[in-house]
Regions:
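An aromatic/glycine/proline-enriched structural segment found at the starts
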Residues: 1-27, 36-37, 196-210
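Extracellular/periplasmic bilobed ligand-binding domains
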Residues: 10-12, 48, 63
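M16 family metallopeptidases and their MPP-like homologs
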Residues: 26-43, 64-171, 191-196, 203-206
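Active/ligand-binding-proximal structured segments within catalytic/core domains
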Residues: 32, 42-56
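Bilobed periplasmic-binding protein-like "clamshell/Venus-flytrap" ligand-binding domains
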Residues: 178-196
Length: 210
């Protein structure tokens, strides 16, 4: 099983990187990625998944409030079951080049808020309900069952994780999610990638660490 090859480090270049594209001159992409952990501990993997949903809700609300536009930012938690100790948490937003500074401020502010205070029960419910519904719907289709069968030998605990997952999700508290944000989404701990139009000045040349 190549156990000696199941280690994957996260880059030490925790800084801002700028890439250029040849598309429309008004389009930019901001991405921030933090290292997290693998997916062997189901409870912690679910906490990160729920934090992902909350990040998306909070950031969407913040961008709408600050910029007055209905941008659809993304957030993603990936906890590897192949590489030991490896996982990532990422946030991204595709925006107008003129709004890169305000968007970046909104992202870093949202991350800081999740570290500094526990989210409300209302926000937690908004994030958790769709995940619980996905558990209920998973085995209503042939595709859901085939997903279990397909990995029955490579991931024999998959069914057990499914059975336990719903109750673990219900038990997650705002305080636990704040602790997860504090542990993994550290200030200065992210790799930031800004994709900007070729030939356009970098609006964040002197940006502080994310």
């Amino acid at each position: 099983d190549y156990a000696d090859r199941r280690d994957r480090p996260f880059t030490k270049a925790r800084k801002r990187h700028v890439l250029r594209h040849n598309g429309a001159k008004d389009q930019a992409l901001i991405t921030m990625i933090w290292p997290t952990r693998d997916g062997e501990d189901l409870e912690q993997a679910l906490q990160l998944e729920l934090l992902e949903k909350i990040m998306r809700i909070q950031l969407t609300d913040t961008l709408r409030e600050k910029l007055g536009k209905a941008y659809s930012p993304g957030a993603s938690s990936n906890t590897s079951r192949t590489y030991r100790g490896y996982g990532t948490f990422s946030v991204n937003a595709s925006v107008d080049i003129k709004e890169v500074p305000a968007t970046r401020t909104a992202i870093t502010g949202t991350v800081s808020a999740l570290r500094d205070a526990a989210v409300s029960q209302d926000v937690l419910t908004r994030a958790r309900e769709p995940v619980l519904e996905s558990y209920d719907n998973l085995l209503k289709t042939n595709g859901g069952w085939l997903g279990f069968v397909d990995r029955a030998q490579t991931e024999p605990d998959r069914i057990e994780r499914y059975v336990k997952g719903k109750e673990l999700l219900k038990a997650i508290t705002p305080a636990q999610l704040q602790a997860v944000a504090q542990r993994y989404l550290k200030h200065g701990g992210a790799v930031e990638i800004n994709v900007l139009p070729e030939g356009v000045d970098d609006p964040m040349a002197a940006a502080p660490p994310s």
